[in-house]
Design a protein with these regions (language model features):
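Polytopic alpha-helical membrane proteins, predominantly small-molecule transporters/carriers
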Residues: 1-290
Length: 290
């Protein structure tokens, strides 16, 4: 469980960094690009990827995990870009809701792809998880009608984040080979993001570089602990998918209330309570009823 807790803490720290980035003159797109360079370095020096004596391109061509490398390497930066467009055309509240409700996809995958056993406590936990998410995401402020571009952006966010979660579970199943998978994934993601920025002819800034270093450290350990959590709960992916999503939004809500003075309604606090109850059901209820 400690891996999941560390992953949640790192993820919320990433959110806090992105929240204060613009006030510090950090261009988020540039920070994301530099973040991948840091992640590549940490993967190489800490995880020591094993290419089995092959060159980078040879390993990429021969590995059975190449589809995962390519999918994650493209999706990680692309979904970020889609998220920024969704925020622009549909608003941050709707975009955040789409990201959180993407939990539906990995939950379905847990039982269809990863063959997790569906028990009554898990059904209760899943239902409570979505009730909690809806309550936390409930906002009283009125929003304008969403445009067609906004709808496409929200669908992209929902599908993209859900697919990334499923792919990281596949990475976790690779066992000791996951350091190599992460190294290649980050390398491909860096290429995609830097290509995007060069095509935009972005003006590079020092604050963005510094922010990218910090972001890279936090993001690397967020992903590392998330994968290790999946390996620890190999037979219970629902707990990791739901626990990560719920934990991030609950801690993020509390952090926003206490550090950024964000207004949290009673129904939001009720959602936090229900969400924590969902994690209890997913982790403990099976053991209690056994």
């Amino acid at each position: 469980m400690h891996n999941l807790i560390f992953a949640i803490l790192c993820s919320v720290a990433v959110s806090v960094l992105l929240k204060v980035a613009r006030k510090k003159n950090i261009i988020i797109e540039q920070a994301i690009a530099f973040n991948y360079i840091v992640a590549i370095s940490l993967s190489y020096f800490l995880l020591k990827p094993d290419f089995k004596g092959l060159e980078f391109t040879e390993y990429l061509a021969q590995s059975d995990s190449t589809p995962i490398f390519l999918a994650l390497g493209i999706l990680l930066p692309t979904v970020f870009i889609i998220m920024s467009k969704a925020v622009e055309f549909a608003g941050i509240v709707r975009s955040d809701a789409a990201q959180r409700l993407s939990l539906f996809l990995p939950i379905v995958a847990s039982f269809i792809i990863f063959h997790e056993t569906l028990s009554q406590p898990k059904i209760v936990g899943i239902i409570l998880a979505f009730i909690g998410l809806f309550c936390i995401l409930n906002k009283s402020n009125e929003q304008s009608a969403v445009t067609f571009k906004g709808i496409l952006g929200l669908i992209g966010v929902w599908f993209g984040y859900g697919t990334i979660d499923i792919l990281f579970k596949q990475v976790a199943k690779s066992g000791g080979a996951f350091p190599t998978t992460l190294f290649i994934t980050f390398s491909l993601a860096a290429c995609v993001m830097f290509l995007y920025l060069f095509l935009k002819r972005t003006q590079w800034t020092v604050p963005s570089f510094i922010g990218g270093i910090i972001l890279g450290v936090l993001n690397f350990f967020n992903i590392l602990f998330y994968i290790k959590a999946h390996q620890s709960f190999g037979q219970n992916p629902t707990l990791v998918f739901a626990g990560m999503n719920i934990g991030v939004i609950c801690l993020g809500t509390i952090t926003g209330a206490f550090f950024f003075k964000e207004k949290i309604s009673q129904i939001n606090w009720f959602g936090v309570f229900i969400s924590l109850s969902a994690i209890f059901c997913l982790y403990y209820l099976d053991k209690i009823l056994a």
